[in-house]
């Protein structure tokens, strides 16, 4: 039920900016180049980081993902990027579901 609710919330939250994993991966590649200091690269990097942050925040509010307070924003962003790099065959799927899939095995909330 929580997964369904999270999917619905993410769909509603991101529907105006819905993107696929391929688009998210492109932004991840720009994120990695941000030190080159071009406006387009910096913008894409910010979109990538913001998208991952927003998705993680949504999953945390719904108690679906529970990263430790010691986990940095950069670690989450890098983990999602690594998942996108290593799984090109799924990048046509919704970006929000790929963020979840990248993090679920590592940061799932413990069941009581």
Predicted regions and their residues:
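Short, compact, well-ordered microdomains
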Residues: 81-112
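Surface-exposed loop/turn and secondary-structure junction residues enriched for glycine/proline
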Residues: 4, 68-69, 101
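Short N-proximal segments of mature Sec-exported proteins
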Residues: 19-81
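N-terminal signal peptide c-region/cleavage motif recognized by signal peptidases
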Residues: 13-16
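Sec-dependent signal peptide recognition
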Residues: 1-8
